[in-house]
Curated annotation (Swiss-Prot):
Protease I is involved in virion assembly and maturation. Protease I cleaves the portal protein to yield mature procapsids competent for DNA packaging. Isoform scaffold protein Z probably helps the capsid proteins to assemble into a functional capsid. GO terms for molecular function: peptidase activity. Induction: Expressed in the late phase of the viral replicative cycle. Expression of late genes is activated by the viral late transcription activator C. Belongs to the peptidase U35 family. This is Protease I. It comes from Escherichia phage Mu (Bacteriophage Mu). GO terms for cellular component: host cell cytoplasm.
Length: 361
């Protein structure tokens, strides 16, 4: 669990550039003149770099108010009965008046009050001191909340400063502030689970931001599609290119019905013709109708064309041919055995039939 403490640090001397910028904290590891901090792991003191400085600037920006510069940190002692004239501001600065200079440190551009500027010009104050919370594990500075003009930067010990910090934000007072339960639930909805009594890690924060970015992108897509849908609904339909779906479905059904009727009629015509030509038996018709339904009229017609007509069937199934009297013609159909007998006897079919008729008398 991370622990936070409060630090106070002052430069060796108040140094103001010609353009009004002055150094608030040095770059890298640093400590107070009296050796503080004593509770940072490894004993390397407080620490600030460019990345930390960026967070400090954004932290000040999130306050939505200027940071106070007072005299001798009197704001931390206001509950001790100090007179009002000792609680006045010496100056102010905001996030836009903060600047990180690599290798040098964190600089601010204070807006001094006229009285403070005069006292600085007169040399009444020699140091600029900052009040900040820090991580006891790394020494990293966590926030800039107050600054002060002072002449005794090491006079205030940590115990005394901690006791006087009642008016600072919660982050300066609480070493272990539990995460807001609503925030924990929100992170869980984003797929980021933070254990109870634990701080959110940088990786978890990045995952939450990525999830929010994804939601934002998807929301943009939904908005774009909604706009296109609304536009399409308002636009008039070009009836030369589109027809109502009801009309299309009705036409499709009529076409299917007509096609089925046409196929049935064509199949019947093919079977009638084959039957008249003696290519099929009447008893085959039901089977052939089913076959035609499966393979199609064209395929069935091609198969029937290959079958040899049977003269007897043609004569029996025609409705127009007249069957001549057996007394006037010898035309008849012989069985296979009779045809074999004709060939064996060396006579014609007519002669065979005549012989057969005489035997039947």
């Amino acid at each position: 669990m991370k622990k936070h403490a409060i630090g106070i640090a002052a430069l060796n001397a108040l140094s103001i550039d010609d353009d009004g910028w002055c150094q608030l904290l040095p770059a890298g590891h640093f400590s107070a003149r009296d050796g503080r901090p004593f509770d940072v792991t490894g004993g390397q003191g407080w620490f600030i770099d460019g990345e930390i400085a960026g967070r400090l600037v954004e932290g000040v920006r999130a306050l939505n108010q200027d940071v106070l510069i007072d005299y001798e940190h009197n704001q931390l002692r206001k509950d001790k009965g100090l007179p009002p004239e000792q609680l006045v501001a010496a100056g102010w600065f905001n996030a836009d008046e903060m600047q990180w200079r690599e290798g040098e440190g964190l600089f601010i551009h204070p807006r001094w009050t006229a009285a403070a500027q005069q006292r600085i010009d007169d040399g009444e104050f020699g140091y600029l001191s900052a009040v900040f919370p820090y991580d006891t594990a790394t020494g990293a500075v966590l926030q800039i909340r107050l600054a002060a003009l002072t002449n005794d930067p090491g006079a205030t010990g940590m115990k005394k400063l901690t006791a006087l910090a009642a008016d600072l934000p919660d982050i300066l007072q609480q070493e272990n502030k539990p995460m807001n339960e609503t925030l924990r639930k929100l992170l869980a909805r984003l797929g980021v689970t933070v254990p109870e009594n634990a701080d959110i890690t940088d990786e978890q924060a990045t995952a939450a931001l990525t999830a929010l970015d994804t939601l934002e992108i998807n929301a943009g897509k939904v908005a774009a599609l909604s706009a296109e849908l609304e536009k399409a609904q308002k636009a008039a339909v070009d009836l030369t290119k589109y027809v109502p779906v009801e009309s299309y479905n009705a036409l499709r059904d009529e076409l299917a019905q007509a096609t089925a009727q046409s196929a049935t009629a064509s199949l019947s015509a093919v079977l009638d013709k084959a039957e008249q030509e003696g290519r099929i038996f009447k008893s085959e018709r039901t089977y052939l109708e089913q076959l035609g339904g499966q393979i199609g009229v064209a395929a069935l017609s091609a198969q029937l064309e290959k079958k040899q007509p049977i003269a007897a069937l043609s004569a029996m199934q025609t409705t127009t041919a007249k069957i001549p009297s057996q007394e006037k013609t010898a035309v008849a159909v012989l069985s296979a055995d009779e045809q074999a007998a004709v060939k064996a006897l060396g006579i014609t079919e007519a002669e065979y039939l005549k012989m057969k008729q005489e035997q039947e008398k």
